Amino acid sequence: MSDTEQLRQAVQAAIADNSFCTLATSSAANRPHVVGVLYAAVDGILYVSASDASIKARNIAQNPRVAVCIPVWQQHGLPPLCVQFQGTAEVCALHDPRMVALLQTGKLDAITGHGALDIPGSCLLRIAPGRRVATYGVGVPLDELMRDPLHADRSVVLS
């Protein structure tokens, strides 16, 4: 397996195996906003529960371009490993057929199991990563990361 394919698999696993990220949005007036959110990953797409009145949902409705940073792992003495990407997002109503299917199959239980969708105005955010994903430390051998942490950045095309 090539180094590129190994990195691609490591990135896909990091996205699938984690559940917290920071989500950066910007309003139509270019006012930035960043917030930590829980997510569920389904087939490489991130889903976040939100209120349609929240800043993140309002910003996405105005401007679908987002950025995401997923902290992956931290070793004492080293910066946290992470996956980051730019992508597009959309605000989805709970009755959207795509969301209904995911909810019925339980694929979004990790973000909906605590009653978040029972609140009036609840919605789901659907975040699709762009083609290229950047990383820090992901797929880098630990000895190399410790020896040369300034050169532990990588990027890969997801497909």
Listing of model-derived features with the role each one plays in the protein:
Residues 18-52, 68-72, 81-84:
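Short beta-strand segments
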Residues 2, 79-159:
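Charged, gly/pro-rich active-site loop segments
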Residues 23-27, 74, 110-118:
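Short helix-to-loop capping/linker segments positioned immediately adjacent to catalytic or ligand/cofactor-binding
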Residues 2-22:
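Short, basic/aromatic recognition patches
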Residues 51-55, 105-106:
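Short, solvent-exposed aromatic-acidic interface loops
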Residues 14-15, 60, 103, 127:
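A generic structural signal for nonpolar/aromatic side chains embedded in well-ordered alpha-helices
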Residues 55-92:
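Helix-adjacent hinge/juxtasegments
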Residues 18-20, 36, 63-65, 121-124, ...:
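Short, surface-exposed beta-edge/turn micro-motifs
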